[in-house]
Amino acid sequence: MSDVAIVKEGWLHKRGEYIKTWRPRYFLLKNDGTFIGYKERPQDVDQREAPLNNFSVAQCQLMKTERPRPNTFIIRCLQWTTVIERTFHVETPEEREEWTTAIQTVADGLKKQEEEEMDFRSGSPSDNSGAEEMEVSLAKPKHRVTMNEFEYLKLLGKGTFGKVILVKEKATGRYYAMKILKKEVIVAKDEVAHTLTENRVLQNSRHPFLTALKYSFQTHDRLCFVMEYANGGELFFHLSRERVFSEDRARFYGAEIVSALDYLHSEKNVVYRDLKLENLMLDKDGHIKITDFGLCKEGIKDGATMKTFCGTPEYLAPEVLEDNDYGRAVDWWGLGVVMYEMMCGRLPFYNQDHEKLFELILMEEIRFPRTLGPEAKSLLSGLLKKDPKQRLGGGSEDAKEIMQHRFFAGIVWQHVYEKKLSPPFKPQVTSETDTRYFDEEFTAQMITITPPDQDDSMECVDSERRPHFPQFSYSASGTA
């Protein structure tokens, strides 16, 4: 699709993702799937070109509801393995019908276009053994993976759409994080959701500092993603133990994070959105692994206001809090927060009261310990600029701007990617099955968190749901 055109535009009320209030936003829906909102109606093309959020209606699921307000509609899609939702309402049922029809039409058009491209790449629509099959599954599973092949050790996270469990593969003794999403969340009762392209993006993502997908499969009611679980321990654990990292150590971790985010932004067109200390782990050699175990936490409530938040408020960028639609620069704010924690031993902004915390994030100037060097101060000041357009990395150069900052002078970025830099700390683990950095409580004994149902075996084909997810199984065994 060479020419990107606006399919529909107009005012919508958008519900805040974190502070659940409704705000008027002027939205543009384009035929390439882009769906972006502005505080005010953009008057000219230049304003429209400003980098905004990367929300796409490709492979989305649309739902209509009369709650919490009449004429509400929800757009839901999988970004990576995380369910992303946006909630809108309009004044009349007719208006809602116009918007949902336009969005569905764009989504269907993109799906058709992609299917045609897939047919073209595979040479023949009917030949399933060709390039298409290779594209979808790098190494076809020798057998169907099932839930029975894992021991279930610990609940790592639980949310509205599913859960993440630390599992051990019985055959190899290796540890993985299994993200289990409820299928009905993604397959609406009346329609088929298109999760497979997103699944393919994940399968084809290869970066040394991103958690790799090992398997994905389905049961009668769940989609399961089995991802690497690095056993060098959480960075949070190591930082709590040492209180603060040297600038050199922080530079090493920061460089690996920048390399991974650069890949997501430039190669995959994905904004990670969820960079925080808990999502950073070390592998057995001491290199960074950014995890994708995220689930929207349920019911994080602030007693004073009873507004519900999704995620960790301390890490939220100002533009996310204000619900200005946002782009790649949110990830550089997240980088600023985690690097500040590493070098200063505390969060840049903190208050137990969420309202006060948000005020600090939006208004408070950043302060540094006297011990911090000038390059580190300059880097953190740049990354923690309130205005995303002024932020380091907020321009069109994105990650390149950060790579060229003097804090990273002397870093050869190709060497970072190739893991040629020597990690400043090597975890004391002997192999990928060494559990010394795991909590003792769950390595000492196996606990069954999710006993697999009898019909969770892949051999049981659920005739009603199954056709919606053709080829939803994947194994990276060929690359392990």
From Swiss-Prot:
Task: Give the Phosphoserine positions (modified residues).
Answer: S124, S126, S129, S473, S477
**Keywords for the protein's UniProt record, in alphabetical order:** Acetylation, Apoptosis, ATP-binding, Carbohydrate metabolism, Cell membrane, Cytoplasm, Developmental protein, Disease variant, Disulfide bond, Glucose metabolism, Glycogen biosynthesis, Glycogen metabolism, Glycoprotein, Isopeptide bond, Kinase, Membrane, Mitochondrion, Neurogenesis, Nucleotide-binding, Nucleus, Phosphoprotein, Proto-oncogene, Serine/threonine-protein kinase, Sugar transport, Transferase, Translation regulation, Transport, Ubl conjugation
Q: Where is this region: Disordered?
A: 113-138, 450-480
User: Which SUPFAM superfamilies does the annotation name?
Assistant: PH domain-like (SSF50729), Protein kinase-like (PK-like) (SSF56112)
Result when mutating Y474F: 55% inhibition of activation
Result of mutating T305A? Reduces O-GlcNAc levels; Reduces O-GlcNAc levels even more
Where the record annotates domain PH, the positions are 5-108
Q: Which reaction does it catalyse?
A: L-seryl-[protein] + ATP = O-phospho-L-seryl-[protein] + ADP + H(+); L-threonyl-[protein] + ATP = O-phospho-L-threonyl-[protein] + ADP + H(+)
> What CDD domains does the annotation carry?
PH_PKB, STKc_PKB_alpha
**What does the record's free text say on domains?**
Binding of the PH domain to phosphatidylinositol 3,4,5-trisphosphate (PI(3,4,5)P3) following phosphatidylinositol 3-kinase alpha (PIK3CA) activity results in its targeting to the plasma membrane. PI(3,4,5)P3 is also required for phosphorylation at Thr-308 and subsequent activation. The PH domain mediates interaction with TNK2 and Tyr-176 is also essential for this interaction. The AGC-kinase C-terminal mediates interaction with THEM4.
Q: What is this protein called?
A: RAC-alpha serine/threonine-protein kinase
Species this chain originates from: Homo sapiens (Human)
